[in-house]
Amino acid sequence: MASQGTKRSYEQMETGGERQDATEIRASVGRMIGGIGRFYIQMCTELKLSDYEGRLIQNSITIERMVLSAFDERRNKYLEEHPSAGKDPKKTGGPIYRRIDGKWMRELILYDKEEIRRVWRQANNGEDATAGLTHIMIWHSNLNDATYQRTRALVRTGMDPRMCSLMQGSTLPRRSGAAGAAVKGVGTIAMELIRMIKRGINDRNFWRGENGRRTRIAYERMCNILKGKFQTAAQRAMMDQVRESRNPGNAEIEDLIFLARSALILRGSVAHKSCLPACVYGLAVASGHDFEREGYSLVGIDPFKLLQNSQVFSLIRPNENPAHKSQLVWMACHSAAFEDLRVSGFIRGKKVVPRGKLSTRGVQIASNENVEAMDSSTLELRSRYWAIRTRSGGNTNQQKASAGQISVQPTFSVQRNLPFERATVMAAFIGNNEGRTSDMRTEIIRMMESAKPEDLSFQGRGVFELSDEKATNPIVPSFDMNNEGSYFFGDNAEEYDN
């Protein structure tokens, strides 16, 4: 957490390590990725999946979910203490799709969690390899971010649905550790805090007793994580107020909503990492790639290179557009759901269209859908250029943005102006400016008002040719400043339902 003065790179968070040098980090991230790949290969063998079936993204997701479920200790304990009819707490499973006589068939499988834990540990040199599990969680979270809207969740906590660019990582489980916290958006953490405060308001005992003490520690820790994401002194000072409150209530909720809104212009630092489906790592390991020896980085060229020569398939519903399905998965792979479409499109080398214009639903297929009517097609996950992922929000400035999403959260460290609709954002700040945080509020509003549209973020940073592995020749793209940059504009995506 930034507040304790220990800035670790993502890779260190990702691998749970202390400070390491670049080579050690590359090796330990490589070890984690190799472990996921070995696990996937072994599961395909156990399930007798053909090479083609093993490359199907839906099968990859089922296998990933099984291992996450096998290691979800809290839920496993809960299931054993509260047995529900027809559910075996010791088993996990899901749909596996097989190609039989030229048609896709769904088979529901059940596996002992113990057996899956054994396969996972065996693939990871006998260790629990929590970092690898978190990595899978982040891939699922990135896929959810690209696929679903969180309008309902935002409205429920009193936030504005147009603040969706702050909601990265909103479906990540609590147990995702430091690496999970790093990729959560400002809105996601504000929402978790608001939920806690609301429970405290409704339940007298929430902050009391031994349990309450633990709750309080969790509350303060979460406040520190959020504080560490803000880049201005006034925002951080306001977070100190929220954290130190004796009895958090509506005033703190107001402050958190204010801070979340302010992040539309004074952006927080949110980490971005390219987390790929397990089958991609499996394919690479199977073809003889030694991740630990070669080293790997989640924020450099490596994921791009991996996707350049991996063939992954997806089931496609009868009225879906395969190119749109590919865009959805590409965005998820690079954690680019809230990135400016102009930037994503330039890197990908293909037009990237807003969510509302995509003719595709999510990747996962519901149990009541007819699989036999579906075909499979190759996902086009290659890119024209690559760019370094950012862990900062870029500096602030503004420009015309859309009705659906009024700001972006940059993913790639590439020079551009960051679009946001100043009039819309500022309209939310009329009025409430009294109370103990008034001076900080005034300062924050002043900074937001002085943000300029022509300011460039990530100055001088560019994209790189895929042959330029050492990032020596940045190509700084020029963008049409008036073009639409928001993905969730005019949105008709499905809501995320747990």
Swiss-Prot record:
What segments bear the compositional bias annotation Basic and acidic residues? 8-22
Molecular function as annotated in GO: RNA binding; structural molecule activity
Q: Which UniProt keywords apply?
A: Capsid protein, Helical capsid protein, Host nucleus, Host-virus interaction, Ribonucleoprotein, RNA-binding, Viral nucleoprotein, Viral penetration into host nucleus, Virion, Virus entry into host cell
Give the residue ranges of motif Unconventional nuclear localization signal.
1-18
Q: State its role.
A: Encapsidates the negative strand viral RNA, protecting it from nucleases. The encapsidated genomic RNA is termed the ribonucleoprotein (RNP) and serves as template for transcription and replication. The RNP needs to be localized in the host nucleus to start an infectious cycle, but is too large to diffuse through the nuclear pore complex. NP comprises at least 2 nuclear localization signals that are responsible for the active RNP import into the nucleus through cellular importin alpha/beta pathway.
Similarity remark: Belongs to the influenza viruses nucleoprotein family.
Name of the protein: Nucleoprotein
Q: Which organism is it from?
A: Influenza A virus (strain A/Swine/Italy/437/1976 H1N1)
Q: What is the lineage of its organism?
A: Viruses, Riboviria, Orthornavirae, Negarnaviricota, Polyploviricotina
Protein's gene: NP
